[in-house]
A protein has these predicted regions:
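Active-site beta->alpha loop and helix N-cap motifs at the rims of alpha/beta catalytic domains
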Residues: 5-10
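Histidine/acidic residue-rich metal-binding segments in metalloenzymes
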Residues: 11-186, 202
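Gly/Ser/Thr-rich active-site loops/lids in small-molecule metabolic enzymes
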Residues: 93, 205-221
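Short acidic (Asp/Glu) and glycine-rich catalytic loops that position anionic groups and cofactors
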Residues: 152-158, 196-204, 218-222
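C-terminal helical cap
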Residues: 162-172, 176-180, 218-237
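Short acidic-hydrophobic catalytic motif
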Residues: 189
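A beta-strand-loop signature enriched in Asp, Gly, Thr, and Trp
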Residues: 199-210, 229-237
Length: 237
């Protein structure tokens, strides 16, 4: 779990060294949602965390893309679960990942990319790592084991999360990234809304459905059974 930046001002920046010193070295920011930081704010917290010996973790999706496509799909197909992934395409993640990496390079700061879901985003990470930039990337079991075909199921709402499930090609790329070390963390992004909550809040539009799935209790068993036992990962990896 991370503390989250929802705005940046002098008072927030001044408290970063204290927070890190108290044992909370990683803090999180978003490039989408109402509490997102703009590029200037991201640069400020990247630099402040660098100086304090901390690390910024970033949820990477382009807010303008999600808003533009979401508004369109809310009018055209509000109850189709596929409207969710269509409102957050792969380029939405890749643009934000690329931008965060450029900002981190400018600030001369390390950065942590959370819940990577696309081959396009992974390509950006690999390019930065190859150039010597200190970048840590994570993905999650849901992006390794499920794809967007799940949204066609009867209760496709239960798979709504952000970023959304992707293609089979993206899944394969993420396994490769985890195996070769480009992705060094498999986390959960645990967010356990019930199916009943999703049905209720998403009944008028799937774009109002709360996003997230549980995963804390299944992460290790899934990585072992689907990764190690299927030859995708070595046990030491």
């Amino acid at each position: 779990m991370h503390g989250v930046f929802q705005h940046v001002d002098d008072a927030v920046l001044a408290r970063i060294p204290e927070v890190v010193a108290q044992g909370f070295p990683t803090l999180k920011a978003y490039t989408t949602y109402d509490g997102r930081l703009d590029d200037e704010g991201l640069l400020q917290v990247l630099a402040a965390l660098r100086d304090a010996g901390g690390l910024l973790a970033v949820h990477c999706e382009n807010h303008a893309i999600t808003r533009f496509l979401g508004d369109k799909l809310r009018r055209e197909a509000p109850r189709d679960p596929m409207s969710h992934p269509r409102s957050r395409p792969a380029r939405c993640e890749a643009e934000a990942v690329n931008r965060i990496l450029k900002l981190a390079k400018t600030a001369e700061a390390p950065v942590y990319i959370v819940h990577l879901s696309t081959a396009e985003g992974l390509a950006c990470v690999r390019e930065a790592q190859k150039a010597g930039q200190p970048v840590i990337a994570e993905t999650c079991p849901q992006y390794l084991l499920l794809d967007e075909s799940a949204y066609a199921e009867r209760d496709g709402l239960k798979y709504i999360m952000a970023p959304p499930l992707r293609t089979e090609a993206d899944r394969a790329a993420l396994w490769e990234g985890l195996a070769d070390g480009s992705i060094s963390v498999a986390a959960t992004d645990h967010c356990s809304f019930s199916l009943a909550q999703k049905r209720e809040r998403g009944k008028e539009s799937v774009l109002d459905c709360p996003g997230g799935v549980p995963g804390v209790e299944t992460r290790i068993p899934l990585l072992f059974s689907e990764g190690v036992l299927h030859g995708r990962l070595t046990l030491p990896r």
